[in-house]
């Protein structure tokens, strides 16, 4: 285009020069003629005419205004470059310009007139020559323009970087366009020169006009927000492939702005464009697409796959929600004169978008920002390599209308360049959109498209895998088959490794206690052989597979949650938990509500025990619940009562039902309470008599008193006459010099000796021998020990009295007497409802019990007073006046009980000591069975006697 611009400038200059010369000659002729036709009455003013102000000088390089494009119609294509309208300048303008009027008479008088023939020829020839030159210029311009369009027909129409637009940062690009085209206010002419540039991700080389290279306002905003590097570096050219028209999508190939269905989780960004395809190219593309579709159908591609690569429409209204961080895209019309606004709007309508608004000015085509990428769900289609799919898609389309999705961060291989000079460096690649690295990305070249990787473990695509040159095979099927074989070989080679690393499914645990293997003994587990039993892996995984809670829930869970039954409309009066408890109690009691109601009406406690009445008393409802149950009408209410509510409602129909239950419970427990109190008071009376009349206990106290006085001689604690029974518990704390014998041991042994001697003296049946005095003494101790050990049995009621509590007994008596008031209250309430038939029966039963209960309560109260008085007397009997200081009335029985337990333990120890002493005495002094019987072997016995005498004499001699 620089040569065309230079030629047009020379033509315009020539036209202007010729127009000026012709105008001057015409002026001279006009002046000469006007001198011949002067008016009869010239102007009276002698002042010279004021010359007209000169008009603005035409620019040296006049601007060529571009009219707005005409509206597009269905049957007509609007050229991308509108026809240039030349300004009305040059010779034509000079001929149409009128000569200045005014007084030129002075000048005409000075000049000499020429011949009319010599002056008319230039005035006629020069305008004709000007028109001819102008027509030739216009014809040459359109011829050159048509030639450029024919040469650029195979260019990358609609491809980013396919024209001669200067790719700069969006802000610098807009400033550069305004400076070059004459500013933003005036009409600007498109650049005449064209350069071929290539942008990252494009595969075609085309011509692009500056008008379509400007980004849209939304694109500028997105680019400003993203920010690109101002550094421009040239990229090596790609192979001779072109981007297809916007929306072009070959079936099964996934090109033209759409990703292949088998592209897996990898996402590509492909800039979109639109261009016209020639008839031959369309025919070839249709044939190749049919072949690829047949091959894809034979491989049964996955239906319903979702496109993972977004498509960018060229209309600003095509995208309703632009992504803020998506990179701006540029598109250039590669086929000048064949691409129109209608074609862009039609391509947008192909995707089901709303109709595009009116076309923008030619110098500011708008492109919406790309929508965010959508992720493709896993499909059951067989895995395939994205590199193979992209290569087959490349072979199935022509080199003029193919859009291959590529990674925007990978440089393509260099194609042959045919630029006129060194191309300026293109802009840096746009940054990835938001969430690009978080999406599931797998490495290209692997054959596992169904692999699901976590975002943290998925590495980005390797640039080295894309830099390798693709094989230029004319048949796409052959390339796909080779790739399939390679993928199968790779899968076969790594099959063993994948099987080894595949984790087994987790099964349900078996809780047991493991036993450690022992190397020093033979165990049953050592007899097991490894080949004796084989686990059926398939069966055990089917039966006992475990579904962990943190794993993803399956579509159809194996274990369904138990479906809770729909809540019924019953159990709305009582609390659900209370109603359930009442129903459980009724089933446990195994009684019907009719039986309970009859017993309450009659006051009969013979058929029901205290346990049943206590359970009924626990079922008593609150005041609010009682009101609800009484006012409930089952016939008119939609709510159904449960078994517990029905039972309580039937019971509440009886007057003061639960007060009757309380009175009947008192009657049922009356006999047992009276018997318990009688026995308790009798035990207290007997315990007091035992302590007062126990001879052995008194002798034990005497022994302790004498021993204590002997030990306390010379102190202020000596010469005691009595002591509190608490001293008996301190006897075991005083130990002898050997550390084992206590003061209680000494007292017991003394009592044993005295009691044994009394028993032996009273028992004269056993003759005493003077030869064995030690044996007789041991026998006496044994008899005395039996007497002392029997003291606990003698004071058995004292032990029972020690387990009683005076406060508890008093409360029982008070409760028993207070229960009579319940009976009287029930009788008073029954007087008010004597109109009922069952009221008389209840009244009679209550009156009969009331007479008998009054007598029993009086006797129990009298017995209580007697028992407490005896306890007080026995306490004073042992403690004297200090009995008033006792906080617990029955404490004396507890002290005696504790002493008896210690005494029993000491008696057992003394008995073991006596047994050892008796055994040792028997060995040293053998006693014949009958000394009057003759000996069988007298000589042997005499010999033994002599030997024993010699030994005794020897020991006696050696002892001093």
Swiss-Prot record:
Segments of this protein annotated with the region Disordered: 39-114, 208-510, 550-573
GO molecular function: actin filament binding
Superkingdom of origin: Eukaryota
Keyword presence, Membrane: yes
Transmembrane segments: 122-142
Gene name of this polypeptide: FH1
Record's compositionally biased regions (Polar residues): 214-228, 271-282, 300-318, 387-396
Species classification: Eukaryota, Viridiplantae, Streptophyta, Embryophyta, Tracheophyta
Feature: compositional bias, Low complexity: 328-338
Keyword hit for Signal: yes
GO cellular component, one term: membrane
Keywords assigned by UniProt, alphabetized: Membrane, Signal, Transmembrane, Transmembrane helix
Family, similarity comment: Belongs to the formin-like family. Class-I subfamily.
Name of the protein in its database record: Formin-like protein 1
InterPro entries: FH2_Formin, FH2_Formin_sf, Formin-like_plant
UniProt cross-references to Pfam families, sorted A to Z: FH2
Signal peptide: 1-22
Membrane topology: Single-pass membrane protein
Species of the source: Oryza sativa subsp. japonica
One example of a Gene Ontology biological process annotation: actin nucleation
């Amino acid at each position: 285009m620089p040569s065309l611009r230079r030629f047009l400038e020379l033509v315009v200059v020539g036209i202007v020069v010729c127009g000026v010369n012709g105008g001057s000659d015409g002026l001279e002729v006009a002046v000469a003629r006007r001198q011949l036709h002067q008016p009869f009455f010239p102007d009276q003013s002698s002042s010279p005419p004021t010359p007209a102000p000169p008009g603005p000088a035409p620019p040296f390089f006049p601007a060529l205004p571009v009219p707005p494009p005409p509206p597009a119609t269905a049957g007509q294509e609007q050229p991308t470059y509108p026809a240039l309208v030349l300004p009305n300048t040059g010779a034509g303008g000079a001929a149409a310009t009128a000569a200045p009027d005014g007084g030129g008479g002075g000048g005409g008088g000075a000049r000499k007139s020429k011949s009319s023939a010599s002056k008319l020829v230039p005035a006629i020839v020069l305008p004709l020559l000007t028109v001819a030159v102008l027509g030739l210029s216009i014809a040459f311009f359109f011829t050159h323009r048509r030639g450029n369009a024919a040469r650029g027909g195979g260019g990358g129409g609609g491809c980013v970087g396919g024209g001669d637009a200067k790719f700069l940062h969006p802000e610098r690009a807009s400033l550069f366009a305004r400076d070059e085209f004459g500013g933003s206010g005036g009409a600007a002419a498109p650049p005449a020169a064209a350069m071929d540039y290539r942008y990252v991700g494009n595969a075609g080389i085309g011509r692009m006009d500056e008008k379509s290279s400007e980004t849209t306002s939304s694109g500028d905003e997105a680019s400003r927000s993203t920010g690109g590097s101002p550094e421009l570096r040239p990229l090596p050219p790609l192979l001779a492939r072109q981007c297809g028209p916007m929306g072009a999508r070959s079936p099964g190939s996934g090109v033209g702005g759409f990703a292949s269905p088998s592209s897996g989780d990898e996402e590509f960004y492909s800039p979109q464009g639109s261009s016209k395809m020639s008839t031959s190219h369309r025919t070839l593309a249709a044939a190749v697409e049919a072949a690829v579709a047949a091959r894809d159908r034979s491989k049964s591609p996955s239906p319903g796959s979702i496109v993972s690569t977004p498509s960018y429409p060229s209309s600003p209204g095509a995208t309703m929600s632009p992504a803020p961080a998506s990179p701006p895209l540029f598109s250039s019309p590669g086929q000048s004169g064949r691409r129109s606004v209608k074609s862009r709007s039609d391509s947008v309508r192909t995707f089901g978008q709303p109709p595009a608004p009116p076309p923008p000015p030619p110098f500011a085509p708008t492109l919406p920002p790309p929508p965010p990428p959508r992720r493709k769900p896993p499909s059951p289609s067989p895995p395939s390599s994205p590199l193979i799919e992209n290569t087959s898609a490349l072979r199935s389309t022509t080199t003029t209308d193919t859009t291959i999705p590529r990674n925007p961060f990978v440089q393509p291989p260099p194609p042959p360049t045919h630029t006129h000079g060194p191309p300026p460096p293109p802009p840096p690649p746009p940054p990835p959109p938001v969430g690009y690295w978080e999406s599931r990305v797998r490495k290209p070249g692997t054959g596992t498209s169904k692999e699901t990787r976590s975002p943290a473990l998925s590495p980005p695509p390797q640039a080295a895998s894309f830099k390798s040159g693709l094989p230029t095979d004319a048949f796409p099927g052959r390339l796909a088959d080779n790739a399939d074989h390679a993928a199968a070989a790779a899968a076969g080679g790594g099959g063993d490794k994948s099987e080894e690393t595949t984790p087994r499914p987790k099964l349900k645990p078996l809780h047991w206690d493991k036993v450690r293997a022992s190397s020093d003994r033979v165990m049953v587990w050592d007899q097991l052989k490894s080949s004796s039993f084989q686990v059926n892996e398939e069966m055990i995984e089917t039966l006992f597979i475990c579904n962990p809670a943190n794993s993803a829930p399956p579509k159809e869970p194996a274990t369904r949650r138990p479906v809770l039954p729909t809540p019924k409309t019953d159990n709305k009066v009582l609390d659900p938990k209370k109603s359930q408890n009442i129903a459980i109690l009724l089933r446990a009691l195994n009684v019907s509500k009719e039986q309970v109601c009859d017993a309450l009406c009659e006051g009969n406690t013979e058929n029901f025990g205290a346990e049943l009445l206590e359970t009924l008393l626990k079922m008593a409802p609150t005041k609010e619940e009682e009101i609800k149950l009484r006012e409930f009408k089952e016939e008119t209410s939609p709510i159904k009562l449960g078994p517990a509510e029905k039972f309580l409602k039937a019971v509440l129909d009886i007057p003061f039902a639960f007060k009757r239950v309380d009175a009947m419970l008192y009657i049922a427990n009356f006999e047992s309470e009276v018997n318990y109190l009688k026995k308790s008071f009798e035990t207290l009376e007997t315990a007091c008599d035992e302590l007062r009349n126990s001879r052995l206990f008194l002798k034990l106290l005497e022994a302790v008193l004498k021993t204590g006085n002997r030990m306390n001689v010379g102190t202020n604690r000596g010469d005691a006459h009595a002591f509190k029974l608490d001293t008996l518990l301190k006897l075991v704390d005083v130990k002898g010099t050997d550390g084992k014998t206590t003061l209680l041991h000494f007292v017991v042994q003394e009592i044993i000796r005295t009691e044994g001697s009394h028993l032996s003296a009273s028992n004269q049946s056993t003759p005493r021998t003077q030869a064995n005095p030690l044996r007789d003494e041991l026998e006496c101790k044994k008899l005395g020990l039996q007497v002392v050990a029997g003291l606990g049995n003698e004071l058995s009621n004292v032990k029972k009295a020690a387990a009683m509590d005076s406060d508890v007994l008093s409360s029982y008596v008070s409760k028993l007497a207070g229960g009579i008031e319940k009976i009287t209250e029930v009788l008073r309430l029954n007087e008010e409802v004597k109109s009922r038939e069952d009221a008389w029966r209840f009244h009679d039963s209550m009156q009969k019990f009331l007479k008998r209960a009054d007598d029993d309560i009086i006797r129990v109260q009298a017995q209580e007073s007697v028992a407490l008085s005896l306890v007080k007397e026995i306490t004073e009997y042992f403690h004297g006046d200090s009995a008033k200081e006792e906080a617990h009335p029955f404490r004396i029985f507890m002290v005696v009980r504790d002493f008896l337990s210690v005494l029993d333990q000491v008696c057992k120890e003394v008995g073991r000591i006596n047994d050892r002493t008796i055994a040792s005495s028997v060995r040293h002094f053998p006693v014949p069975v009958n000394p009057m019987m003759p000996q069988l072997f007298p000589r042997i016995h005499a010999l033994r006697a002599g030997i024993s005498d010699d030994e005794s004499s020897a020991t006696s001699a050696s002892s001093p």
